[in-house]
Amino acid sequence: MHASSPSVRPIQALSDQLISQIAAGEVVERPSAVVKELLENALDAGATHISVRLEQGGVKRIAITDNGRGIAPEQLPLALARHATSKINSLTELENVATLGFRGEALASIASVSQLTLTSRTADAAHAWEISGVQSIDQKSTVAPSSGTAGTTVDVLDLYFNTPARRKFLKTEQTEFGHCAEVVRRIALSRPDVAFSLTHNGKTIDHWAVNDIARRSAHILGNEFSAARLPLKETAGPLRLHGFIGLPTASKARGDAQYFYVNGRFVRDKLLMHAVRSAYQDVLHGDRYPSYVISLELDPALVDVNVHPSKIEVRFRDSRAVHQFVFHAVTRALAQTSATAFGAAPSPTPAPSSALPWLREQQQSTFAPQFNSPYGVAQSAANYGALFANGPASNDSNSAAPSLHTAGSHGATTLPDDEFPLGFALAQLHGIFILAQNTKGLVLVDMHAAHERILYEQLKHALDDNELQVQPLLIPITFYADGMEVGTTEDNQDILHALGFDIAALSPTTLAVRAVPALLKNADAQTLARDVLRDVREFGGSRVLLERRNELLGTLACHTAVRANRTLTVPEMNALLRQMEATERADQCNHGRPTWVQLGLSDLDKLFERGR
């Protein structure tokens, strides 16, 4: 084809305006992207109060005002220029960037697809100055005096007015506003030291005053999360993790309450989400999603934030170490839970000293330390250790749970030391539930679910204490593999051996599985190997092995646990309570359902309308 053909054009340089509009396709995906970029600029400027005003879901207008450092008038034209920024000036600074923004392209991209006005005033300036974005190559920006307090206001009108094709892809006004409001919530959660206000079509939607993360998260995520959250605080070398995670019993049907931050930046990172999900994997019911607000802080040099145009993904220098740190931190936090109050959400346990250590607080409550125990069961816990066995139910009349009318034959007993938060058994209900009494009131226990969790944790610990048994295959399983699978196999032999696998590359397109973990010897070796290789490649380890192992142990525990309608003696019931107190995660069964609830004295008063 000749160069003179009308279908072929000569190579030519694009105009700055067109370049900015092309870049806007990635940076300014929808109105919420504009809100995000402008809020990040305000925070980088040191703002302590930020106002967000929207009209028609942000399409008609987005105006964001802050009280930050402001921009000097001579630098206003540079603020709207492409690839101009005050945040970095070298590759070294880029690799150690600590600010939310750094590319210097957001304002130029936004100005290319809207009517933008930037008004700013520094603290030492006599008045504010403003500049408008240019809409054609013939137009020039001019800086003019204006009114305004110290700080910056960016006013974005008629978004996509000059790119009508982009407007066609926008959703309804309420949908676009919902996305904008979610961006404000995300950033407000990351900076509780900054006050935020949000207005839509002249109506105030939200206002968040300066406070701590506990109050800010309660304000944004609601009382349900506030009542069912666990504190998270871990440090290991250069890594620091803090925030709140929701209890498994307060999980949600959608993953819309998951907020993870890396050095103050909200991210949707597969590695981090995988680590959190792995920690929850044997305490969540079905396809439920946990809620959390987690912040990870580390040296900026250890994380690359220049991975995605929206900066929502990051890359860690040592991804495996970060994954393991987050996984173990969340796992330890989930092991510290307390009772589920009757008719209320579960509450966290602040002390890490035992599986259920909240009774120290109850010991100091207004409840009397003495209560009547009808069966005289307040005896040493050592007497219960060997009683709870899975033999057949006894036909002896003494093995049946005593009826409540026998209570009067026993005198009052004293509540023992505070290592018995679940109290002591009173009776068994319909062969399913255990009724127990503690200083706070009445405890209701699902005995099968509780025993299932106890056995499950015991099986896991027993397996973890021994070396992983490997089962060599009599005939190796060979299968076709792509280049990534072969490369992962060759580069990660140590990890694969630690997981109990012997996988070798026979050719550039063939892998052979020679050994698998003995516990999974009946699984499909090819499918198992592919799943493990995928996890090792993406996360530096495999959740597949843990999931398969836990599925088998969970099934074994379920079939071994005491069944419904089995009559237990009072000592057997007390032995189960003691085992629950000594077992991590005893508050949920293997499927994420609660194993016990607390019915407090105040709850009983309400049921009988006492005190009215």
UniProtKB/Swiss-Prot annotation:
Stored InterPro entries: DNA_mismatch_repair_CS (IPR014762), DNA_mismatch_repair_MutL (IPR020667), DNA_mismatch_S5_2-like (IPR013507), HATPase_C_sf (IPR036890), MutL/Mlh/PMS (IPR002099), MutL/Mlh/Pms-like (IPR038973), MutL_C (IPR014790), MutL_C_dimsub (IPR042120)
A biological-process GO annotation: mismatch repair
Keyword Transcription regulation among record annotations: no
GO CC terms, sorted: mismatch repair complex
CDD domains the record matches: HATPase_MutL-MLH-PMS-like (cd16926), MutL_Trans_MutL (cd03482)
Pfam families membership: DNA_mis_repair, HATPase_c_3, MutL_C
Keyword list, A-Z: DNA damage, DNA repair
Protein name as annotated: DNA mismatch repair protein MutL
Protein's organism: Herminiimonas arsenicoxydans
Gene of this entry: mutL
